[in-house]
Design a protein with these regions (language model features):
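N-terminal membrane-sensor/transducer module of prokaryotic signaling receptors
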Residues: 1-117
Length: 117
């Protein structure tokens, strides 16, 4: 698993949401809400867990990843409900979404260092 790439992909969610807001597109909120559907989620719940599941850095990354997807799912639901101003505000600076985005990125970077991957 390339954790640098995983960090990038999770950072890109803000741009995906902004594009969906502008284009007024529907999103798969149910899948976005789940922390085991994206590539890093599958890895965290599979190989990552079996190899590094006892490391505190792994447990933190797993927790932060779950929180990220829960918050991302809320944004997707706002978009699907056509609450575009609310969705845009939800991904702005200083929001819970921004905070969990930073936290999951930091947690994945710390896991990478601790696991030597």
């Amino acid at each position: 698993m390339n954790l640098d790439e995983a960090v990038k992909k999770h950072i890109e969610w803000r741009a995906k949401f902004r594009l969906a807001i502008v284009k007024k597109e529907q999103m798969d909120a149910a899948t976005i809400s789940k922390d085991n559907c994206c590539e890093v989620g599958k890895w965290l719940h599979g190989e990552g867990k079996s190899r590094w599941g006892s490391k505190p850095e792994f447990l933190r990354a797993l927790d932060k990843h779950k929180a990220f997807h829960a918050e991302a799912g809320k944004v997707a639901q706002l978009i699907n409900a056509q609450k575009y101003p609310e969705a845009d505000a939800a991904i702005g600076n200083g929001t819970t979404f921004e905070n969990v985005s930073k936290e999951v990125s930091t947690a994945l970077i710390l896991l990478k260092k601790a696991a030597g991957i």
